[in-house]
Amino acid sequence: LKKLISKYHITLISLGNGTASRESEQVIVELLKEIPVKVQYIIVNEAGASVYSSSKLATEEFPQFDVGQRSAASMARRLQDPLAELVKIDPKSIGVGQYQHDMNQKKLSEALGGVVEDCVNRVGVDLNTASASLLEYISGISKAVAKNIVAYREENGRFEARNQLLKVAKLGPKAYEQCAGFLRINDGKNPLDATGVHPESYAAAKTLLERLGYTTEDVKERRLDGISKKISNYKKLAEELGVGEITLQDIVKELEKPARDPRENMPKPILRSDVLEMKDLKPGMILKGTVRNVIDFGAFVDIG
C-alpha cells in the first residue's frame, strides 16, 4: 500500500463501511503515521457495491478485474462522483428501510427510479463525459438513445454544441426538447450550452444580456454575478422578452452562476486521519452523521 501511495501520489483513500471496515481503518491509520506525505481517508457507503461488481456493466467496464477489484474501483468512484456511480445499480440495492420488501415492488421501483431521475436532472450532466448509465436518467433519453449518444461521441469526438444531439440515432426533435436543458457542454461553441438555459430560451437570454450590457463571452468568463440586482421589474421584462416570468427568473439564475451544482450547498465530507472511538465521545458534542436505516424503534446514525 505504501508503494501504491508513493507511485500514484495518492492523497485520499476511499474506505467502504461494510465488513471489516473498522479493522481496515485501523490498518490505514497506522500506515499513515509511517509515511511522510499527508494522506487522508473517508468512509464511503458501500451499499450495493457487491451488486454492481457482479453485474454485466461492471464486467464490461473492468473485464480484467475480479469481483473484489471491481468493488474497490466502485468505492473510489463513489468518492469522486457519487451520483455518476450510484446510478449504475438498482436503487433498491442501496437499502431504503426496514419494510422495503413488504411493499409493492413495481411501485417501489417506479418511485425510486423517479427520485434518481429527479436528482440527475436537477444536477445536470456533462454531455462529453457522462456514461450511458447516467445519460439514461436524463428526461427524454432511453437506454438505447443513451448508448447511441456515447457511440456517437466515440466515433465523432466531443460534442461542440447541443444541437449536434439531433444527429444521434433515434434522438428526434421531441426528445431533444426534453433533454437539452439538462445536458451541459463545457468549452463548446456557445457558452450558453454550459448552463441550464434551454435552447428555446437562447434568444431571450442573449437579448437580456445585451440590455444589461453583457455578451455570451461574459457567461463563459463568469462575470455575471449580481445581474439579478439590475432587474427591477421581472414581470415587465419577461413580457418584453416574450417569456414567462418564472422562465426569466430561471434564466437569470443560470446566467449568474452557470453550471452551478445544487450539491455545493450540502455539508462537505469529513476527511480523516485518525480513528473515532466511543471513548472520544463527550456529553454536549455536536457531530455530523448519516442515517443508514430507519426501523420501528429508532434510527441507525453513522457518525464514523
Model-derived features with residue positions:
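Conserved, well-folded catalytic cores of nucleic-acid-processing
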Residues: 4-11, 16, 30-38, 47, ...
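Short beta-alpha connecting loops at secondary-structure transitions
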Residues: 12, 54-67, 96-100, 118-120, ...
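Short boundary/loop segments of OB/S1/cold-shock single-stranded nucleic-acid-binding domains
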Residues: 263-285
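S1/OB-fold single-stranded RNA-binding interface
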Residues: 280-304
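Phosphate- and other anionic-substrate recognition elements at nucleic-acid/protein interfaces
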Residues: 1-113
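Charge-patterned, long linear interaction tracts outside catalytic cores
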Residues: 81-152
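Flexible loop/turn segments at secondary-structure boundaries
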Residues: 20-24, 49-52, 158, 186, ...
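Accessory alpha-helical DNA-binding modules that contact the DNA backbone or grooves
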Residues: 122-265, 272, 300-302
